[in-house]
Amino acid sequence: MPDITYYPAETRQLGAYVAHPRGQGPWPGVVVVMDALGLSDDIRIQADLLAAAGYLAFAPDLYSGRGIKCVVATLQASRSGAGEAYEDIEAARHWLTERADCTGRIGIIGFCMGGGFALLSAPRYDFAAASVNYGDVPKDAVDRLAGASPIVASYGKRDPELKGRAQRLETALTALNIEHDIKEYPNVGHSFMNRINAGPVLGPLTKFVRMNYDHPSTEDAWRRILDFFDAHIRDADA
């Protein structure tokens, strides 16, 4: 049953959404990193999908207890690789490892801004695998991703903000000999896996970056993610 909980980060308590699989644990865990819209209903849906697949899903609210200025700071951190949000993500991973209903094998998944965090957390923290969904890729990816966990990533070819990122990531991970599965979907744009209720304020932005949920591409992306996580997180427990 999903619930809201609080967990200790470096300097404060943070809220989080937790989705538990059915049946008896322990289960492998996944930290679910939100997009710029925050801990939305959509991010809860992503966590629920992971729980249905047998993963203890933990989605921290990186905006907890901070004002509107934290949104800009958190967005910048997802690209720079520096900032308090990374400490919060590591605290989330640690929270999972301390639970009796978790095997201690933890993955990370992120969407948009969260995809950037997932990518740069892969070489930094002890994650067994990472799923990057339309997250930015730094130009110096070869330097920044050395020692990263295996990575599965999905991008939309029609995303005007992230042109060439799928190929940049593919090139870097190949050079580093890091196991990966990178796919660029030809007919979709940004956030194609997310059901976003944009409203009047964000509506123009969603049109600019072609943010439209696409069911066939989403189904294929989730199939790849779960196959990848099963191989690198779940099967490693056997």
Map each language-model feature to its residues.
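Serine-hydrolase catalytic machinery in alpha/beta-hydrolase-like enzymes
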Residues: 4-101, 195-212
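Short alpha-helix in the alpha/beta-hydrolase fold that links the catalytic acid
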Residues: 46, 163-173
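Primarily recognizes the serine-hydrolase "nucleophile elbow" in alpha/beta-hydrolase
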Residues: 89-148
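Conserved serine/cysteine hydrolase catalytic core
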Residues: 138-148, 159, 223, 227, ...
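Short, proline-enriched alpha-helix->beta-strand connector loops that line the catalytic pocket
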Residues: 146-151, 176-179
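Short beta-strand/loop motif that positions the catalytic acidic residue
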Residues: 152-155, 185
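Acidic catalytic loop of the alpha/beta-hydrolase fold
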Residues: 157-163, 190-191
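C-terminal catalytic histidine-bearing segment of alpha/beta-hydrolase fold enzymes
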Residues: 179-238
